[in-house]
């Protein structure tokens, strides 16, 4: 029996707003709703084409004159940690990992607030209250987990949270939706450790990829992702090895981006009916 999506998803475009990664540029996103019984299949399919999830929405950068944001993922089987990354793993070997359902807690929010206030006080999420935080964690129509990392303690109640990551589970890997950590533990390099541990989780689960979100050449905020071996980027409609990061440019040109209608026409859907799928 052939199963199809009852209604082909509609794609929309956000209004331009200030880019959080490259100064002086405007960002625009192509997005669609993620809902219903076919949400997991749609998410699995579009994630392979550079889309990311935010609550009940799948989106991909579609800026008018810029194509700098490149979806990035690590090939788990080929990953080899650097000497520095091995030291990070050793330094955090005492942390306890706990995978839970996507349910927000006060301890998570307290850590989230400390992280934002220290690292991203002027960012777009700086004003998030506990209800918005709960929505970010809990509003997921697909398989998601919250991975908590705690320091040793005598009892479960005496194990302070060190780091947290909201993680989606795809048919081909893990996607790190959002992570945050204790800013007072800077010496542990917890951001790097959470990535390294997700590579290990994927390896144990037999999943080939860990999706890191977007790598942006020229952005200091996103430059760290290029330090991981076996990194692939989604560029020109296909996944390819990143090669030398310096070979990629964040150039600004009106011909660097195809029209929205052409972008949407090339999106592969899971056994969907053909037809017009874009709306401005």
UniProtKB/Swiss-Prot annotation:
GO cellular component: cytoplasm
Source superkingdom: Bacteria
Lineage: Bacteria, Pseudomonadati, Pseudomonadota, Alphaproteobacteria, Rhodobacterales
Known EC number: 2.3.2.29
SUPFAM superfamilies: Acyl-CoA N-acyltransferases (Nat) (SSF55729)
Function: Functions in the N-end rule pathway of protein degradation where it conjugates Leu from its aminoacyl-tRNA to the N-termini of proteins containing an N-terminal aspartate or glutamate.
Protein name from the UniProt record: Aspartate/glutamate leucyltransferase
Transmembrane segments: none
Main location: cytoplasm
Top EC class for this record: transferase
UniProt similarity note: Belongs to the R-transferase family. Bpt subfamily.
An annotated Gene Ontology molecular function: leucyl-tRNA--protein transferase activity
GO biological-process terms attached to the record: ubiquitin-dependent protein catabolic process via the N-end rule pathway
HAMAP family: Bpt
Keyword Acyltransferase (UniProt): yes
Keywords: Acyltransferase, Cytoplasm, Transferase
Reaction catalysed by this enzyme: N-terminal L-glutamyl-[protein] + L-leucyl-tRNA(Leu) = N-terminal L-leucyl-L-glutamyl-[protein] + tRNA(Leu) + H(+); N-terminal L-aspartyl-[protein] + L-leucyl-tRNA(Leu) = N-terminal L-leucyl-L-aspartyl-[protein] + tRNA(Leu) + H(+)
Keyword Acyltransferase: yes
Pfam families: ATE_C (PF04377), ATE_N (PF04376)
Compartmental location: Cytoplasm
């Amino acid at each position: 029996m052939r199963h199809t999506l009852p209604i082909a998803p509609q794609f929309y475009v956000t209004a331009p707003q200030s880019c959080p990664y490259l100064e002086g540029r405007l960002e625009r996103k192509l997005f669609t709703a993620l809902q219903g019984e076919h949400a997991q299949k749609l998410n699995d399919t579009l994630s392979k084409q550079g889309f990311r999830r935010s609550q009940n929405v799948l989106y991909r950068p579609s800026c008018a004159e810029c194509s700098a944001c490149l979806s990035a993922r690590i090939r788990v089987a080929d990953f080899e940690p650097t000497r520095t990354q091995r030291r990070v793993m050793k330094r955090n070997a005492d942390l306890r990992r706990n995978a839970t359902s996507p349910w927000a807690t006060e301890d998570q929010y307290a850590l989230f607030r400390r992280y934002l206030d220290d690292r991203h006080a002027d960012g777009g999420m700086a004003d998030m209250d506990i209800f918005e935080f709960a929505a970010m964690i809990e509003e997921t129509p697909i398989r998601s987990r919250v991975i908590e990392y705690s320091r040793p303690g005598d009892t479960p109640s005496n194990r302070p949270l060190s780091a947290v990551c909201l993680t989606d589970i795809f048919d081909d890997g893990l996607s790190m939706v959002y992570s945050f950590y204790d800013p007072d533990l800077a010496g542990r390099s917890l951001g790097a450790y959470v990535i390294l541990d997700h590579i290990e989780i994927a390896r144990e689960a037999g999943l080939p990829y860990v999706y890191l979100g977007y790598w942006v050449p020229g952005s200091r905020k996103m430059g760290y992702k290029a330090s991981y071996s076996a990194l692939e980027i989604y560029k020109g409609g296909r996944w390819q090895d990143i090669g030398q990061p310096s070979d990629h440019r964040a150039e600004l040109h009106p011909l660097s981006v195809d029209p929205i209608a052409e972008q949407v026409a090339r999106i592969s859907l899971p056994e969907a009916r053909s037809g017009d799928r874009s709306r401005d």
